[in-house]
Each structure stands twice: as C-alpha cells, then as structure tokens.
Amino acid sequence: MRVPFADLKKEFKRVLLNLLFAEAKAELCAHILAANSRDGVYSHGLNRFSAFVNSVKGKEVDVYAEPGFVESHGMIDIWDGNSGAGMYNASKAMDRAIEMAKTNGIGCLAMRNTNHWMRGGTYGWQAADAGCIGICFTNTMANMPPWGGKEPRLGNNPLIIAVPHTDGHIVLDMAMTQYSYGKLQQSRMNNEEMEVYAGYDGDGSLTHNPSAIIKSRRALPIGYWKGSGLAFILDVLLTAITGGKSTAAINSTVNESGVSQFFLCLYKSDYNQMLIDEIIRYTKSSATVEPGGHIRYPGENTLATRQFNEEHGIPVDEMKWEELLKM
C-alpha cells in the first residue's frame, strides 16, 4: 500500500494538532516525520509515530516547550530543550548553527534536556540544503554493551556528517551499532533477518535475528571495539559541553528522555565540487562483488528512494496506516 506524501503529512499534522501542538510546530514535526518515511527511513516515520504520541501522552514530551538559550562561549551556543519535541528542537538548533556559520564560517550549538530527534540524517540534509557542511550527533539510552561487556552501558549515539554536492548531497547517517534499533524493529515487524551479524542472542552467540537482539539488548557495535570507543567518547563530549544527561543518567529514567545533542556547521562559498566528483568517480570505479552490483556514496540511495516515493507514493504498513487514521 502506498500513500502520497501530502496525505501522510496531513494525517500526522491532524493528530499533532489534536495533541495541542501549536500550528507551526505541528507543521514542522509532521513534515519531518513524513519526510523520514518518504526517504525510506520508515522506522522513524509512520512506524514510530505511535511511540511518539505515547511519549506526549506520558508527559515525556512537552507540547508547549520551546528550546531556550542558556549561555554562549564564542561560536558555541548552549541551549536547553526544555523536554520539547525532539525533531522540532533539533531543527531549530540546526537553523541556529546554520545562521552562525553563514555569518562567521562556523557555528556550533549544543543542547541538553531534549528528546529523540527521529532520523538524525534529517538535520544533515537541512545543513547541506542551506549550503553548509553539517555534523551532528546525539546520545541515547544504554542499548549496546561496551566491548568486552555483556550488559548495555553505551548508547548507539547516531553520528551524521553532511557535505553539500551539486548532484546530490553526501550525507552519512550512522548509529554506533551495526543496525539502529529502529531498523531492527522494522525488520522484526517484516519478519526479516538482518543481512549481516547484528548482535548477540541470549546465549551470547552472534545472530542475524532482530527479535533475539532486541530481547538481549546486545547489539553489535560497528568496527567492534572501535564503535564501542566512538560511542563512549561521543557521550563524554556531549555531557562535558552541555552539562546535560549522560547515557548513564538517561538510563535511570523509565523511558528515554532528556538526551543531549550537538550541531556543528561549517560554511564557505565554494566546496571544490570538481574534487568531490573525483572522489566519487574513483570510489565507484571499483569492480563490484556481485555482477551488475552498484557502489553508492552516502546519501545517494536516499535521493533515489525519495524520488521514487514522490512519484509512486510512500509505502506504508496497512495496520500502521489504519492506526494513524483512527488516532
């Protein structure tokens, strides 16, 4: 089943308005959620909407809250998200980082006490669309064991790096686990196994089974000990600069809330597109493992999915769609 982008966005907005979000805030949040599904990140669009609604009803998300300025240190602004909607707060934070970068060449904003931003790549695309290099990351609840450990003590702390490109922006959007938990949940819902080992089951054996990994909470870090180390240092950096909650503090709450996020923008008038094109051509010149296979740069597949779904409609799970219509 497929639905037009406009219809999906309209239904999101209707529900958000009924939850007492202000018009402009409902519009922005609905657009981000619909765009996530449009771009193929279904786990952070329609499929996560009911969880977001529950977080509003459970008072983890304050529909009236606006992110607020706390202090500045040169080109670094510190904000408090005031427990507002994560995607709204993140979009406003990236807007401010872009504004600073357009004036000074660099802009940085760190925010504490905010909520899940849904797809982190949204804010990389936002920066690149504005002509800026964008780097952002967030901490999360503990959902990954440190390398050598059995129990979740690290967040999968997604990292996004975006570079403007005339033929389609380059946008890397990656969790510190081999697969995000959203992707694991999506695969479980579709009764699909993961393509490569994604974590450990309850017996400590590597597995492709998303249900076993979600139950054990032992997702596999990217690059093994390297991903574990990167997840750790991102949490340290965020906590040090924002004065907000670390993964340890986030995990002391019943549900994931009060996370910290970081937004960095760089701006110059010319990004040497010919040199970037050279990197892309050279990368794609490799022989493929599978005959007729494709080598893609980060963000390329997102653009292809976006264009296809804009033309043919966004694929939706019928049960999730009916659930949305009844909200």
Describe the role of every protein-language-model region.
Residues 154, 158-161, 175, 229-245, ...:
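N-terminal nucleophile
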Residues 2-3, 8, 18, 241, ...:
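Catalytic-core signal marking the mid-to-C-terminal active-site face
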Residues 144-211:
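Phosphate/diphosphate-binding glycine-rich loops and adjacent basic-rich segments that engage nucleotide
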Residues 46-100:
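Active-site cofactor/substrate anionic-group-binding motifs, chiefly glycine-
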Residues 189-250:
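Secondary-shell segments that build the walls of catalytic and ion/ligand-binding clefts
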Residues 76-166:
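A generic, well-ordered mixed alpha/beta core segment in the N-terminal half of proteins
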Residues 1-3, 10, 14-28, 34, ...:
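Acidic, glycine/proline-rich low-complexity segments that act as flexible tails and inter-domain linkers
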